[in-house]
């Protein structure tokens, strides 16, 4: 197993005793209500998923990441982990203050020391991180709508986890717990699979091919904030469960969730996803076509080419896969490397196509989804899952 990024797994989660004392303390501090995606960031900082980060970035770190894809100390990092605040809050806060971060349910999430307050050039941020300044890009929209005032500093302790809706708590495992699980299984080579969609037949094929030379696979769906038209996390989890139970060797699969949010930053986010999975104990990660992409903002294999530039610093190794499809002649999943038949015989699968079918109330065919998965999706899409 690889060491965590930067060498040490961060842990900022309050013990039960600390939690009681700090919850009382939070009532005496300046209160800042933060959006769900920053609540997710608090958890990822505190549980070690964002190691070596121990808080929200200062201006120096944020600009270094935006411009040079590294922290100010030279360590590889691809996505700015920053905390935007409103102008009133920004003006009231002084460097050195302790503040209490609250979620929209009025729960204290974390106590933070303000080490920096600053502005950023948002056009430069978006151009470098997302390769576009187009407000229609979901990541750009988040950045630009959040404003240009930021505070940075260490998270002292995480007091409460984000509100979970519909997902069994057993799947919320912190990096230290996943690492322990992997160690107990005796796995040395672990491939991670990132997903924000139900696993269709093309995904299943790629995971199984990737698993062949490995000891185990970490199916690690992202359950933080995604696009409004993405399928909800609780529905996706049911799909993963039935797929693993019916079509995988259960002994070779680890299923848990990643409580991070999507940025849709394509090539840069591929690095971000790899570093998080390295912290969770993976040695390899599947990077497929248009990884963490959206629309037509990135090239099909741009993320794969991009991560190749950083393999020495990443340490976790990318497993790169071309597009796979169902071939009606082969009567099986295949890729251009393995299938001799013309394109007319290929049924190309994607999460986008599955979502479009579901919006129209159509059941995904067996070439797209396993029947058990299709049952769950069509029930959800037609409102019969209540």
UniProtKB/Swiss-Prot annotation:
UniProt feature coiled coil, ranges: none
Pathway: Sulfur metabolism; hydrogen sulfide biosynthesis; sulfite from sulfate: step 1/3
Calcium listed as a keyword: no
Protein's UniProt keywords contain rRNA-binding: no
GO MF annotation list: ATP binding; sulfate adenylyltransferase (ATP) activity
Enzyme class: transferase
InterPro entries: ATP-Sase_PUA-like_dom (IPR025980), PUA-like_sf (IPR015947), Rossmann-like_a/b/a_fold (IPR014729), SO4_adenylyltransferase_pro (IPR020792), Sulfurylase_cat_dom (IPR024951), Sulphate_adenylyltransferase (IPR002650)
EC number annotated for this UniProt entry: 2.7.7.4
UniProt cross-references to SUPFAM superfamilies, sorted A to Z: Nucleotidylyl transferase, PUA domain-like
Catalytic activity: sulfate + ATP + H(+) = adenosine 5'-phosphosulfate + diphosphate
Keywords, ordered alphabetically: ATP-binding, Nucleotide-binding, Nucleotidyltransferase, Transferase
Biological process terms in GO annotation: hydrogen sulfide biosynthetic process; sulfate assimilation
Alphabetical list of PANTHER family matching this protein: PTHR43509, SULFATE ADENYLYLTRANSFERASE
Family: Belongs to the sulfate adenylyltransferase family.
Name of the molecule in the record: Sulfate adenylyltransferase
Organism: Persephonella marina (strain DSM 14350 / EX-H1)
């Amino acid at each position: 197993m690889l060491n965590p990024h930067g060498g040490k797994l961060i842990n900022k989660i309050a013990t039960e005793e600390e939690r009681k004392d700090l919850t009382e303390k939070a009532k005496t501090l300046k209160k800042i209500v933060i959006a769900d995606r920053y609540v997710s960031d608090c958890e990822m900082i505190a549980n070690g998923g964002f190691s070596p980060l121990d808080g929200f970035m200062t201006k120096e770190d944020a600009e270094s990441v935006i411009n040079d894809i590294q922290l100010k100390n030279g360590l590889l990092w691809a996505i700015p982990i920053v905390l935007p605040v409103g102008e009133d809050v920004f003006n009231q806060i002084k460097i050195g203050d302790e503040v209490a971060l609250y979620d929209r349910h009025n729960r204290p999430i974390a106590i933070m020391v303000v080490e920096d307050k600053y502005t950023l050039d948002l056009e430069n941020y978006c151009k470098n991180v997302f390769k576009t300044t187009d407000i229609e890009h979901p990541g750009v929209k988040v950045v630009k709508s959040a404003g240009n005032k930021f505070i940075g500093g260490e998270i002292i302790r995480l007091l409460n986890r984000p509100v979970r809706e519909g997902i069994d708590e057993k799947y919320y495992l912190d990096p230290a717990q996943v690492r322990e699980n992997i160690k107990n299984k005796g796995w040395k080579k672990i491939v991670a699979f990132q997903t924000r969609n139900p696993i269709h037949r093309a995904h299943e094929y790629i995971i199984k091919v990737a698993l062949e030379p490995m000891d185990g696979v970490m199916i690690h769906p992202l359950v933080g904030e995604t696009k409004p038209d993405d399928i909800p996390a609780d529905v996706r989890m049911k799909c993963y469960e039935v797929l693993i139970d019916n079509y995988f060797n259960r002994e070779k699969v680890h299923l848990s969730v990643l409580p991070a949010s999507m940025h849709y930053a394509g090539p840069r986010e591929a690095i971000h996803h790899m570093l998080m999975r390295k912290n969770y104990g993976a040695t390899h990660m599947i990077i497929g076509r248009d990884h963490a992409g959206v629309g037509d903002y990135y090239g099909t294999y741009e993320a794969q080419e991009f991560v190749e530039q950083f393999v020495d610093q990443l340490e976790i190794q990318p497993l790169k896969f071309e597009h796979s499809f169902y071939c009606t002649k082969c009567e099986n999943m295949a890729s251009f490397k393995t299938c001799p038949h013309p394109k007319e015989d290929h049924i190309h699968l994607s999460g986008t196509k599955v979502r479009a079918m579901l919006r129209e109330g159509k059941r995904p065919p067996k070439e797209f989804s396993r029947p058990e998965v299709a049952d769950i999706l069509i029930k959800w899409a037609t409102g019969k899952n209540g």
